Amino acid sequence: MDIIIKNGTIVTADGISRADLGIKDGKITQIGGALGPAERTIDAAGRYVFPGGIDVHTHVETVSFNTQSADTFATATVAAACGGTTTIVDFCQQDRGHSLAEAVAKWDGMAGGKSAIDYGYHIIVLDPTDSVIEELEVLPDLGITSFKVFMAYRGMNMIDDVTLLKTLDKAVKTGSLVMVHAENGDAADYLRDKFVAEGKTAPIYHALSRPPRVEAEATARALALAEIVNAPIYIVHVTCEESLEEVMRAKSRGVRALAETCTHYLYLTKEDLERPDFEGAKYVFTPPARAKKDHDVLWNALRNGVFETVSSDHCSWLFKGHKDRGRNDFRAIPNGAPGVEERLMMVYQGVNEGRISLTQFVELVATRPAKVFGMFPQKGTIAVGSDADIVLWDPEAEMVIEQTAMHNAMDYSSYEGHKVKGVPKTVLLRGKVIVDEGSYVGEPTDGKFLKRRKYKQ
C-alpha cells in the first residue's frame, strides 16, 4: 500500500462504518481487513472519512460586466482543496462570434497544469447560432456532457424559448444535460430600469428588481419546454419557495426535473444587501438572496431529496475594484460571490443543527453530483476501485470564517464572521496528500481534466 488510513469513521451516502482503508496508485484498493505495510499511515481517530467534495457550479476565470474576475485556476482550486473539495466542474464560456471548440481551447489554456484539483467543464452557450447548436454534438466526445443557457441578461446571455427547445432536443440526442439559469430576463430588466429612473440605485434594488416570481415564472417555463421535448433539465441555483414549488410540480407529472441550490441561499438574505457603506454590494448575486423563511424551505427540500446538490456558484468579484463600480447604479455591480472554500463547512452546519443527516451531507456535496454529471463511481464515494479523493474531517474543530484564513484571491468572504463546527483537516487527491492538517502541501500540476460520461437519458 502507498497509504493506509486507520481508525477513522467512513461516511458515504449509503452508510457509516468503522474500517481502515488502503490506497495504492491513486485508487482505493481495500476497505477493512488486514492491510499490511504502507509507505505512510495516517491516523484518523476521531475524524470522519468523507469522499472528496464535488462542486459542479463554479465560475473561476470568468469575464463579465466588462471585467475579469480575481481568481485564477491556481488560486480557486487551492481554496477548493483547503475546503475539502477535490473536483470542480467549471463553466467554460463561449465568446460571442466564436465556436465552442475555441472556448474549450481557451479554458484548457487557463486550467491545464494550473489546477490543484481535478476539473471538468460545462459549456455556457452565449451565441446559439445554428452552427453552434450543431457543434454541441461533438462535446460528449470531449468528455463535456452538460451545457448551460440563460433566460436572463438580454443583450449578454439571454436566449429565447425556441433556442432553449433546440438545445434541449439536441441534448437528448447527444446524451447531454442542459442547465438553465431561470429568471424572466425581460421582467428583471424592466424593474431594474424603472428603479434607476426613480433614483433607486442602491444594492438592495438588485434584489427588489428580481423578486421570487421572476425566478418562478422562468423555472415553470423552462420545465414546461423540457416536458414538451421529453428532455431532462437541470435548474441551477433555486432560491425560493415559489421556484421550488414549480420543480416539485414538474417532478410530480413525470418531468425529469433536476435542481440545485447554493450555499448562500441557505444563509444570506436580501437584508444583507442593505448593509451600510456599500457593503451590501458584496451580496449582489443572481438570483438574489431571499427571505429568511426561504432558508427553512430549502433545508427541508434538501432533507427530502428534492435537490441534487448544494453548489457554491463561486465567482470572484472583488469588493474594491469590481463591486464598487456600481456605487451610483446597482446595475453596474458584477453579479456573483465567492464560496468554493466555505461550501462544505457551511453545509455541514446543517448536520450540527439536525437539518440533514451525515449521510445526506455526503450525498449532497459529493455523491449525487458525481452521479448526475457522469463521474460516479470514479468520484463521489469511498469504494474499492474509486479514486482516492478523501477528506479527513474533524467534527469537533471550530473556527470563525474570516477572509484572512481563506486561500482565494478575494478581499472578503460571503460568510465573514460565521462560526462553524466541523472542518476539513487532511485532503487527498487520487491518493496524494494535498492538504495536511489544514496546510496546503500540493502542487499546481496535481489536477487533471476529467472526461465525464454521457447523461443517462
Curated annotation (Swiss-Prot):
Gene3D superfamilies the UniProt entry points to: Metal-dependent hydrolases, Urease, subunit C, domain 1
EC number per UniProt: 3.5.2.-
PTM notes: Carboxylation allows a single lysine to coordinate two zinc ions.
Quaternary assembly: Homodimer and homotetramer.
Taxonomic path: Bacteria, Pseudomonadati, Pseudomonadota, Betaproteobacteria, Burkholderiales
Cofactor descriptive note: Binds 2 Zn(2+) ions per subunit.
SUPFAM superfamilies: Composite domain of metallo-dependent hydrolases (SSF51338), Metallo-dependent hydrolases (SSF51556)
Cellular component terms (Gene Ontology): cytosol
Modified residues (Phosphoserine): 69
Statement: the UniProt record of this protein carries the keyword Hydrolase: yes
Protein name per the record: D-hydantoinase
UniProt: Zn(2+) 2 binding residues: 148, 181, 237
Function: Catalyzes the stereospecific hydrolysis of the cyclic amide bond of D-hydantoin derivatives.
Required cofactor names: Zn(2+)
Record-listed substrate binding positions: 153, 286, 335
